[in-house]
Amino acid sequence: MASLRKIHPLMKITNDMVIDLPAPSNISVWWNFGSLLGLCLFSQILTGLFLAMHYTSDISTAFSSVVHTCRDVNYGWFIRSLHANGASFFFICIYLHIARGLYYGSYLYKETWTIGVVLLGLVMATAFVGYVLPWGQMSFWGATVITNLLSAIPYVGGTLVQWIWGGFSVDNATLTRFFTFHFLLPFIIAAATLVHLLFLHETGSNNPTGLNSDADKVSFHPYFSYKDLLGFLALLSALTSLALFSPNLLGDPDNFIPANPLVTPPHIKPEWYFLFAYAILRSIPNKLGGVLALLFSILVLVLVPILHTSKQRGLMFRPLTQTLFWTLVADMLILTWIGGMPVEYPFVIIGQVASTLYFLLFLVLAPTAGWLENKSLKWL
């Protein structure tokens, strides 16, 4: 008789996804980040639920309710620290997951990749509205500046901003709706993640060589389930260490000051994981141009499969495109650094050069390198 996990309607789905799933035998540690993102999402939803029990979405009490959670709730300080730093780990895993997809050509699974880009947008939206909730100085001014960018949209911009604010400025209505979105979006992300997995399991996983691995598959459990557990252990150790030893390392000191609409912070900036996009936004002197550049800095990922010109899938045997990939990594780090700097010389010009290079790498240099590599294969 067949095992229950293979015939029960619900257990069969789980079995096909995480137990008897055929996986390429040579996938490396870079394939761990998908499961780590699942762990991050679960951790964020869990800690977020406990924080929501003690939070009040009213401008007069929001800041105090966060202070109350940290001071008076049992282990409230730890839960908040895990949640705030968990967001940073979430984005570290996302960026590494995308980098692996770019390096090994996983973007050629177009449906999986497109849903992944949608997931990135949803996670960014969730993190942005979540950053507003403590109602500190940087929360308030970050919300004001970023939502105000929508006013650059012709004809409907002004109306759209007022509609999002729920009035003529960032106020109580804004905080209430941002809390609603922050509570709702993680569950939408969880649903989109299932769609992401559904599309992935239609094709099966890619592997480091970029070659067909049908002849060399192993079952997901126990080989990769234990490998994922080791990743879980490493991530949770790093997260708890940061939350316990240096919980405010990645935060902004201005957010310890309650929001004051009459005092502007000397330098408004988002959390570190948005700095690269913020640097691209600031590099364009025109408001609408900056908003479009910000939007396309994420949407350019959708074009990657379309602009793939190489006959080979990954970058394992493509030294020219490998060089461009590591140039992109360096460029992202430079943009992240520039996003945290004041708007003055020489940071402005460095940001503009780095932003131009960012788009050139995706739209021009990578497709050209792929074409040149195809040509070079004929010369060998």
UniProtKB/Swiss-Prot annotation:
Keyword Transport among UniProt keywords: yes
Primary location group: mitochondrion
Molecular function in Gene Ontology: metal ion binding; ubiquinol-cytochrome-c reductase activity
One protein family per Pfam: Cytochrome_B
GO cellular component, one term: respiratory chain complex III
Domain of life: Eukaryota
Family, similarity comment: Belongs to the cytochrome b family.
Subunit composition and interactions: The cytochrome bc1 complex contains 3 respiratory subunits (MT-CYB, CYC1 and UQCRFS1), 2 core proteins (UQCRC1 and UQCRC2) and probably 6 low-molecular weight proteins.
Name listed for the protein in its UniProt record: Cytochrome b
